[in-house]
Amino acid sequence: MLLLLKKIYLTFARSSRIIITLVIIDQLSKWWFIDNLRWKPGLMLKVTAFLNMVYTWNYGISFGLMREYYQYSNAVFILTNSIIVCYLYYLMVCSKTIRGFAGYSFVIGGAVGNLIDRLFRGAVFDFIHFYYKNYSFPVFNLADCFITIGVIILIEDYYSTKKIIEEKAKEHYDNAQIKAMAEKIRNTDHNGDNKI
């Protein structure tokens, strides 16, 4: 128990710097654009031929989905997001790689940034809008970027770790032994008893 508490504390001490930095960057960017875009004509600042900064409140989930249920759902979104952040933190504590740790830190930082918006503003502020001719990508914010970066890191970590495990297994066992072990694992339940 003491070892687990120590691991949780060390994970918090290490991850909090990353998470807090990402949350500060996200909240400062939102604050700046809220303060400066509300006075622009059409609530928009044209940056390039394919990028605008726009003043948009997202009352739904990612990319504005379910926004029509806002009056019933904001409390549900806050509760769900809080549970997800706690679960992601648990996964980060269990993570065995630096990439996994970094990936979870980015996802948690982005999720907390959007959670702060929901708690204190009632909706998530989105401002980055990419478009090309008739195609328009849904408006998003830096917290969404952090979540996406974190997910990409976690996917890469999963596949690179899987590859390393497979290579180490091949060094120590031949293919027949690996297949036999996999078959034994498939035929054993979670209590270690044979299913057959």
UniProtKB/Swiss-Prot annotation:
Membrane topology: Multi-pass membrane protein
Transmembrane spans: 43-63, 75-95, 100-120, 135-155
Subcellular localization: Cell inner membrane
Catalytic reaction equation(s): Release of signal peptides from bacterial membrane prolipoproteins. Hydrolyzes -Xaa-Yaa-Zaa-|-(S,diacylglyceryl)Cys-, in which Xaa is hydrophobic (preferably Leu), and Yaa (Ala or Ser) and Zaa (Gly or Ala) have small, neutral side chains
A GO BP entry: proteolysis
Gene Ontology molecular function terms on file: aspartic-type endopeptidase activity
Keyword Signal set for record: no
EC number of the protein: 3.4.23.36
Pathway: Protein modification; lipoprotein biosynthesis (signal peptide cleavage)
Record family assignment: Belongs to the peptidase A8 family.
Job of this protein: This protein specifically catalyzes the removal of signal peptides from prolipoproteins.
UniProt-listed HAMAP family: LspA (MF_00161)
NCBIfam families, A to Z: lspA
Protein known as: Lipoprotein signal peptidase
Gene encoding the protein: lspA
